[in-house]
């Protein structure tokens, strides 16, 4: 996978995606999430790949093991670069996801969501009834993902250093919640700058609104890219 900031294509239509991608004359690493995939379907993935871009298909699969395994068989045929599941689905579900993916595809990386970057300590305790710190909850899910054979996790950059120490540098830490200095944090809570994420051990960062909603998306992307790759 490219060592580039992953741009979250948080658009509701193919037309808006194409207008955005037309601004760039280089190969990108982009994320397609639920909103866009459910609106436009697999054909959009094929079109983005044909443009030469890497794709992270961010659907966060979470269901019974058999359903997730069968769903992953279908997604494997899209030949994206990165897919994910929810670690909360458990070891059996994650194992079936790997089996489904590998029936048709050997190169796509698969990672697990631990805790969303919008989650706070209060939400963890009072809504999820998990009576540990966010760091401990993330580490527990990351250990399960690692033991199951997944390539890494989605986590906050604030947990990246801990996960590198516990699970090694090669274990992927894909981190949303990235904001340039001075940018609005929107609905994210556990956030850092691109430079801080690199220093903390994140292997990939995901950036959406600071690029896609910028007055000059190309300039904003290059500034974030430069700060990430230093």
Curated annotation (Swiss-Prot):
MF (Gene Ontology): orotidine-5'-phosphate decarboxylase activity
Subunit description: Homodimer.
Taxonomic classification: Bacteria, Bacillati, Bacillota, Bacilli, Bacillales
Q: Which residues bind substrate?
A: 10, 31, 58-67, 117, 179, 188, 208-209
Q: In which pathway does it act?
A: Pyrimidine metabolism; UMP biosynthesis via de novo pathway; UMP from orotate: step 2/2
Task: Locate the active site.
Answer: 60
User: What keywords does the record list, in alphabetical order?
Assistant: Decarboxylase, Lyase, Pyrimidine biosynthesis
SUPFAM superfamilies registered for this protein in UniProt = Ribulose-phoshate binding barrel
Tell me where the transmembrane regions lie.
Answer: none
UniProt protein name? Orotidine 5'-phosphate decarboxylase
- List all disulphide bridges recorded for this chain: none
What role does it play? Catalyzes the decarboxylation of orotidine 5'-monophosphate (OMP) to uridine 5'-monophosphate (UMP).
Record's Gene Ontology CC terms?
Answer: cytosol
Q: What class of enzyme is it?
A: lyase
The enzyme's E.C. designation: 4.1.1.23
Q: Which family does it belong to?
A: Belongs to the OMP decarboxylase family. Type 1 subfamily.
Q: Which reaction does it catalyse?
A: orotidine 5'-phosphate + H(+) = UMP + CO2
């Amino acid at each position: 996978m490219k060592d580039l900031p992953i741009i979250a294509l948080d658009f509701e239509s193919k037309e808006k995606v194409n207008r955005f991608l037309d601004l760039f004359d280089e190969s990108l690493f982009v994320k397609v999430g639920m909103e866009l995939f459910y609106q436009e379907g697999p054909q959009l993935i094929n079109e983005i790949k044909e443009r030469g871009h890497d794709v992270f298909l961010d659907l966060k699969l979470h269901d019974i093991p058999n359903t997730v395994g069968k769903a992953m068989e279908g997604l494997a045929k899209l030949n994206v670069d990165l897919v994910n599941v929810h670690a909360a689905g458990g070891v059996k579900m994650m194992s079936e996801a790997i089996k489904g993916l590998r029936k048709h595809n050997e190169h796509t990386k698969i990672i697990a969501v631990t805790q969303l970057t919008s989650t706070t300590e209060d939400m963890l305790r009072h809504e999820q009834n998990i009576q540990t710190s966010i760091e401990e909850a993330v580490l527990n899910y990351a250990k399960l993902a690692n033991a199951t054979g997944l390539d890494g996790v989605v986590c906050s950059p604030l947990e990246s250093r801990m996960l590198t120490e516990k699970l090694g540098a090669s274990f992927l830490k894909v981190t949303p919640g990235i904001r340039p200095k001075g940018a609005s944090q929107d609905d994210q809570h556990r956030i850092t700058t691109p430079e801080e994420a690199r220093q903390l051990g994140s292997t990939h960062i995901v950036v959406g609104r600071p690029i896609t909603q910028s007055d000059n998306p190309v300039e904003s992307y290059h500034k974030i890219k430069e700060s990430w790759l230093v």
